[in-house]
Amino acid sequence: MAAALLVIAWDASAAGPLLVADTFTATTANMTPAGVNLRMQIIQWQDAAARTEVVATLAADPDASTLAKLPTVGYVWPNGSPVGYSVKYANHAPEPDGKERVTLVTDKHLGSYDFKGWSAATAGGSDKPYSVIELELNSSGTGTGTFSLGAEVLLDEAAGTVALKPGGQTLLTNVKRAAGQADKGSRP
């Protein structure tokens, strides 16, 4: 029995701490609740095959319980909340003008843990059981963003990508990449 406990403790310590590939912060705006600070931690940027698997799952069965079974590649943490949202899709796409687009999909819609759910100032968003978050960053790592509460979700199964329909409300302001993470080589 003591040997079994020793092996379990050894395995747990061998895993070590989870390393974070990238961290972004943002503040909710033009919605209820406004002013909520979010921290988005990416443990691992996904390759094309992993992203395609998530998109196929979303296209076949957009039920959150099915999405929850996919590997977790990050978390979205609302400020002051002990509960975060699991990120199941994480894509980083540099754009020709030096900007970058970050797209994340969580297995539950943002605000689902709150007593009163989150709502956008104007209609036009998605009622999916998950959230799609898009961040638009300039070359200095700052910008704005939105998520599926304020924009329609677009799935491209052939390309294995998720996006939000252009022109959606800006629901995330003060978007920033955490200091010291702008030049990480961990992005596919």
Give the location of each predicted region.
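Boundary at the C-terminal end of the N-terminal hydrophobic targeting segment
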Residues: 9-15
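Mature extracytoplasmic/lumenal regions of exported proteins
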Residues: 74, 83-188
